[in-house]
Design a protein with these regions (language model features):
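C-terminal soluble interaction/assembly domains
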Residues: 2-7, 14, 25, 31, ...
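Secretory/export targeting leaders with adjacent low-complexity proregions
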Residues: 12-266
Length: 371
């Protein structure tokens, strides 16, 4: 069955049969089911909101999943998904889906500033305020969602250059210290990290807020400088250049004015990643970041794409996270896990592919890219 539904000038949604999904029969549906089922634990506090699919129907399916064993065998999990959901391929602007990757860095650090660990990650300042971008305060850039509260009203918050020059010094906002400013910079990009503490133990930090300035990819900055070739500005290549050019690295990194503030999060299960925007822990190769304004958290998505080494990646994933760079109906960011090996894959991932949304049976997806 192939039936195009809800067409628009920029978007086509096509109903499919599961037989048209390459690799569906051989997929590890049990792992996908476990990732999906975790959404049931947050239903009462964070129910899904209707965007691309019927949130009420999705919540009902999550409750049914929660009544089943967590270790459901692959064949039973496959039967569950096929009975509860129908697949719809999303094609935007006449093109295919596009997939990148992200990961959780693991680095050494200390809660105490030392000669070795001197680069801080900051907690949220008390003068940072968030506001609705639809009604920004007068006089502020309408693109800003965060600002600094002053006696005269909100103003733009300090940017990366100002903060690294000491704008927040002396306020006791340092959450933890790491050794390498480049590591800290990439923690800002990933929005989370696991830190092996010099004084013993492990802590996890995750995104809490940001300065509000626009994000500038420094890969693009390095290409414009002629330091890297277009198409070769992978995360590994960027890190190598920054390490080889320490005198210029700080200047380049400060071109990204956006600055991230963190909170400490518990390491409840070292086999899982940090808590995602959907309030569930990320699962290696199963959690997908999507456009939160278009899609519904906890919805299954079938992904067909290729990895940086050319191997095919065909996986049933769950929409559990989001990101400021993840924009569009067929845009996905794959969580590859924690540590350096995951970072190598994530940093080179940039592939076209199929984005197939699984919608609750009896309802049709509604993805509106006109925002």
């Amino acid at each position: 069955m192939k039936e195009s539904v809800a067409p628009s000038r920029d978007l086509t949604i096509t109903a499919l049969d599961y037989s048209s999904l390459a690799g569906w029969d051989d997929e590890g549906h049990g792992a996908a089911f476990r990732a999906f089922r975790r959404g049931a634990s947050v239903l009462s506090r964070h129910p899904p909101k209707s965007h691309s699919v019927d949130a009420v129907a999705l919540a009902t399916i999550l409750k049914r999943a929660n009544a089943l064993p967590a270790d459901l065998p692959d064949n039973h999990a496959r039967a569950f998904f096929e009975a509860e959901f129908a697949p719809y391929e999303i094609v935007s602007d006449g093109g295919t889906g596009f997939f990148t990757g992200y990961y959780e860095p693991i680095v050494a650090g200390s809660r105490i500033r030392t000669d070795r660990f001197a680069t801080p990650l900051y907690r949220v300042p008390d003068d940072l305020v968030a506001f609705d971008p639809a009604s920004p305060p007068p006089g502020l850039d309408p693109a800003l969602r965060f600002a600094r509260q002053t006696d005269k009203g909100p103003v733009a918050y300090f940017d990366r250059d100002e903060i690294e020059a000491g704008a927040l010094a002396g306020r006791g906002l340092e959450l933890v210290f790491v050794a390498d400013p480049v590591d800290a910079f990439f923690m800002h990009i990933q929005g989370a990290a696991r830190i092996d503490l010099a004084e013993g133990g492990t802590m996890r930090v995750s995104y809490a807020a940001k300065s509000g300035h626009a994000y500038t990819p420094i890969g693009r900055v390095l290409i414009e400088m002629g330091a890297l070739e277009a198409g070769k500005a992978t995360m590994d290549a960027i890190r190598q250049w920054l390490a080889a050019n320490p005198d210029t690295a700080a200047v380049v990194m400060r071109q990204n004015r956006s600055f991230i503030f963190f909170r400490e999060a518990p390491v409840e299960n070292p086999q899982l990643g940090p808590i995602a925007a959907a309030k569930v822990p990320l699962a290696d190769g199963r959690s997908l970041a999507v456009d939160r304004l278009l899609h519904t958290f906890h919805c299954p998505v079938w992904v067909e794409t290729s990895l940086p080494d050319g191997k095919s990646f065909r996986r049933l994933m769950i929409a559990q996270d989001t990101g400021s760079a993840i924009v569009g109906p067929a845009r996905g960011d794959i969580f590859f896990g924690s540590g350096a090996a995951a970072g190598t894959i994530a940093g080179s991932m940039a592939s076209k592919g199929r984005f197939v949304l699984l919608a609750p049976r009896g309802s049709r997806p509604n993805v509106n890219p006109q925002r």
